[in-house]
Swiss-Prot record:
Pfam families: Aminotran_1_2. PROSITE patterns: AA_TRANSFER_CLASS_2. Its EC number is 2.3.1.47. Homodimer. This is 8-amino-7-oxononanoate synthase 2. It comes from Bacillus subtilis (strain 168). It is an enzyme of class 2 (transferase). Pathway: Cofactor biosynthesis; biotin biosynthesis.
Length: 389
């Protein structure tokens, strides 16, 4: 059998199930109004929560670094890829996250995989939230430790699992801070309380919380007033740049530098990306206006959709999942949205469980009241047309 024939059979099964995906061609910077596949659309699926990815101050910082350092780092940090900008950004992240040190990775995905595949040993166990991001799941799979999954943000189940795993040498509780598909916030205060009681370590992926949650945007740690052992994050969402990081004690960072394969064998992110991210943290620390505007939008949209009769998941975050259920109907809903100039793709299995297909709205501070009015009016009309509300 030719490989294409076999692969086509597998692709056909995905199409029949309504879970086949395609790329969309987008022109211009990541702002709300974009040209997608030749049509003008208002984007409601971007992680650019504070609008910093197109902020002139970040662009200027990156351009200045480009002139001095060029377009790429051209090597691993441990060979020729290290620069003063990498070190400046790591110090900035550690200061922002209130940790001793931080280490950059090429993405948040690689940061999660690097930490979880290198830190726990074979006599250890990882307790992982059921809805953790794929990068955390893959890190657990690559780890030498066993993995036990607990029900999503269910603290009773987590405590039961902690009771059942006391034979292990060390235990690591790993969780997203904000869950990317459900928009829920991990109860980090309760998790850390349990960790102290059962002598476990806590690892938090703060990808969707960094720059967003907490009075100063520090993330879920500030939101709950607690300090996890390890914080992982990305620079590609609210920070508006590229790359990922891990933050914690100086000893932990030294360990990663010597053990995390996704750090050792990766080409470093370009210095220009570091300069842009560094400027983003300066902006986040200096002003709360963008966050305040963002959360006013969140309240407005969540309340309106619930009042229409939609099933809206999640907590008070920029991620608003509107559950449709059937994958085919969800795709149709997304197509009708796009026909009205709204880009919010369908989220289907395997990203979410069967029967949980949804339109995942993400809000940014760059959206306007006109954008919001159009979004809500369109959701109301399509929901009525498809007999969802």
């Amino acid at each position: 059998m030719k490989i294409d024939s076999w692969l086509n059979e597998r692709l056909d099964r995905m199409k029949e199930a309504g879970v086949h995906r395609n790329l969309r061609s987008m022109d211009g910077a990541p702002v709300p109004e974009r040209n997608i596949d030749g049509e003008n659309q208002t984007v409601w699926s971007s992680n650019n929560y504070l609008g910093l990815a197109s902020d002139r101050r970040l662009i200027d910082a990156a351009q200045t670094a480009l002139q001095q350092f060029g377009t790429g780092s051209s090597g691993s940090r441990l060979t020729t890829g290290n620069s003063v900008w990498h070190e400046k950004l790591e110090k900035k992240i550690a200061s922002f996250k209130l940790t001793e040190a931080a280490l950059l990775f090429s993405s948040g995905y690689l940061a999660n995989v690097g930490v979880l595949s290198s830190l726990p040993e074979k006599e250890d166990v990882i307790l992982s939230d059921q809805l953790n991001h794929a990068s955390m799941i893959d890190g657990c799979r690559l780890s030498k430790a066993d993995t036990v999954v607990y029900r999503h943000i269910d603290m009773n189940d987590l405590e039961n699992k902690l009771n059942e795993t006391q034979r292990y040498q060390r235990r690591f509780i790993v969780t997203d801070g904000v869950f990317s598909m459900d928009g829920t916030i991990a109860p980090l205060d309760q998790i850390i309380s349990l960790a102290k009681r059962y002598h476990a370590f806590v690892v938090v992926d703060d990808a969707h919380a960094t720059g967003v949650l907490g009075d100063s945007g520090q993330g879920t740690s500030e939101y709950f007033g607690v300090c996890p052992d390890i914080v992982i994050g990305t620079l590609s969402k609210a920070v508006g740049a590229e790359g990922g990081f891990a933050a914690g004690s100086a000893v932990f960072i030294d360990f990663l530098l010597n053990h995390a394969r996704t750090f050792i064998f990766q080409t470093a992110i370009p210095p220009a990306s570091c300069a842009a991210a560094h400027e983003a943290f300066n902006i986040i620390e200096a002003s709360r206006e963008k966050r305040q505007l963002l959360f006013s939008y969140i309240s407005m949209i969540r309340t309106s959709l619930k009042n229409m009769g939609y099933v809206v998941k999640g907590d008070h975050t920029p991620i608003i999942p509107v559950v449709i259920g059937d994958a085919h109907k969800t795709v149709l809903f997304a197509e009708k949205l796009q026909g009205k100039g709204i880009y919010a793709p369908a989220i289907r299995p395997p990203t979410v469980a069967p029967g949980e297909s949804r339109i995942r709205i993400t809000i940014t501070s760059d959206h306007s009241m006109g954008d919001i009015d159009h979004l809500l009016q369109t959701f109301h009309s399509i929901g009525k047309e498809l007999h969802i509300i």
